[in-house]
Amino acid sequence: MKGRIFSVVGGMFLLTVCSKGDNSQVQAAPPGAELASAPTGSAAGGTITGKIKFTGTAPRNSAIDMSEEAVCKAKYSTPPTEEVVVAGPANALANVFVYVSAGVPAGQTFTAPATPVVLDQSGCRYHPHVFGVMVGQTVEIRNSDAVLHNIKAVAKKNRPFNVSQPSAGMKTPRTFTTPEVMVNLQCNVHGWMHSFVGVRPDPFFAVSGPDGSFSITGLPPGTYTIEAWHEKFGTQTATVTIAGTETKTANLTFAAR
């Protein structure tokens, strides 16, 4: 559910959303975890930066039963869990997709990066769990497990696909042709495997890291609507006005109940 829209012309603002809890286990952000980064805009533009946190008791992620996948199970020193809520220090919230949903000057076009974004299947999980790409940018899907995986894209605006990777070392390139937030990537072989990709026409997006931080750079002067998406807590929108090369701070807080 989307919350109210807040207008900001300077300084800092705070957003709050609500959600229901459950009885699964909280997934802490792994040390040194790498999340997919967004392409950057012009270095001369403005910046929206901030941190995302949650209040209350976070829902706990469900345990994953890998007893039938010894190859994947062997990659974990502790029992693996799902990654629906990845909590960092001081209630930081990772894996939130933050993007500019409105305000980019009409007619302005952007070239997709030539460097592909890598989506790896390792330990019978997708890495990264949440990421973004530009329209036309290649997603290189890899299988680092010596087990069968299949990648099923559940999309509403893009063409769905379903491809198999039966052995380790396989790589499959795919691209998306239409902006869409979000495309759900699944594995029919392993029902717990999910990844979410935000497809955007511009480089103005980011994914919050293990410490909850995000940064969207290179924004021309103007007023923008930003939207934050989380798979459990939903979405929030806000308006932010950028003048020149200034940096605005937007700290977002979700309420977990």
Regions found by a protein language model. Name each.
Residues M1-T16:
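Sec-dependent bacterial lipoprotein signal peptides
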Residues C18-R257:
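Extracytoplasmic copper-binding redox domains, predominantly the cupredoxin/blue-copper superfamily
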